[in-house]
Amino acid sequence: MGRGNSTEVTEFHLLGFGVQHEFQHVLFIVLLLIYVTSLIGNIGMILLIKTDSRLQTPMYFFPQHLAFVDICYTSAITPKMLQSFTEENNLITFRGCVIQFLVYATFATSDCYLLAIMAMDCYVAICKPLRYPMIMSQTVYIQLVAGSYIIGSINASVHTGFTFSLSFCKSNKINHFFCDGLPILALSCSNIDINIILDVVFVGFDLMFTELVIIFSYIYIMVTILKMSSTAGRKKSFSTCASHLTAVTIFYGTLSYMYLQPQSNNSQENMKVASIFYGTVIPMLNPLIYSLRNKEGK
């Protein structure tokens, strides 16, 4: 490995998990099954929505794109993670690391905005049902989804550009199972203050903005539901967004654990565990959540 700057680094060594050898095969099988189940579930949900004319509505247009995003970001990290269990030296080229980080960051960010958009969709469906067809027109929901992809691409491009323009002279060993931002920054011998600021500003804004949209949407939704006189009406309205609320709770609960836990000696290992749940388990759960809680999706 070169010692000068980032252009001299040709590859990184992904350290993966600090687990004993006898458990590696078990983890490999479990994570492989989760990944395959995730692919089957999300591809199946996309095909179901595409082929069933009853599901050609904004309420199912958004989960369709959520499934696509889940496929993309879990596929960006899981194959390389599985490789870490089968190879002693799990290497990734510099270019491969850049691409993995870019793809993962793009779709992980888009995921946040899609969940916020889906909360807004639930708000309009429950709080303004008579105006729903006018507000959530085909043009509007296509623009909203396109916007989530654009924001994800811009966010990821900025982070990728600033991260991989650094000088790496400490080591080429990334203490993670994929090319994630903070473990990569830990290898740099450059001043990373601007990178930390970008992380705080971009990631902080993305999380806070989307969380606030979701929180305020559900505040209005709950107020509207509580005002309903009919028990059946309340139940029907709540079931409309129950699947989304479940998905959001799991998604942001995991992110909160990842980014808000206090720093400690085992915090990096905890981050790896949370990253597994965020990057592999949640994409598997989403199609199950939507299919079980929506009668049309069964």
Swiss-Prot record:
It comes from the Eukaryota. The chain crosses the membrane at residues 26-46, 55-75, 100-120, 134-154, 197-217, 238-258, 272-292. GO terms for biological process: G protein-coupled receptor signaling pathway; sensory perception of smell. It is found in: Cell membrane. Glycans are attached at N5, N155, N265. Disulfide bonds join C97-C189. Signal peptide: none annotated. Its main location: membrane. The keyword Flavoprotein does not apply. InterPro entries: GPCR_Rhodpsn (IPR000276), GPCR_Rhodpsn_7TM (IPR017452), Olfact_rcpt (IPR000725). Residues 1-25, 76-99, 155-196, 259-271 are extracellular. GO terms for cellular component: plasma membrane. It is a multi-pass membrane protein. GO terms for molecular function: G protein-coupled receptor activity; odorant binding; olfactory receptor activity. CDD domains: 7tmA_OR5AK3-like (cd15408). Residues 47-54, 121-133, 218-237, 293-298 are cytoplasmic. Keywords: Cell membrane, Disulfide bond, G-protein coupled receptor, Glycoprotein, Membrane, Olfaction, Receptor, Sensory transduction, Transducer, Transmembrane, Transmembrane helix. Belongs to the G-protein coupled receptor 1 family. Odorant receptor. This is Olfactory receptor 5AK3.
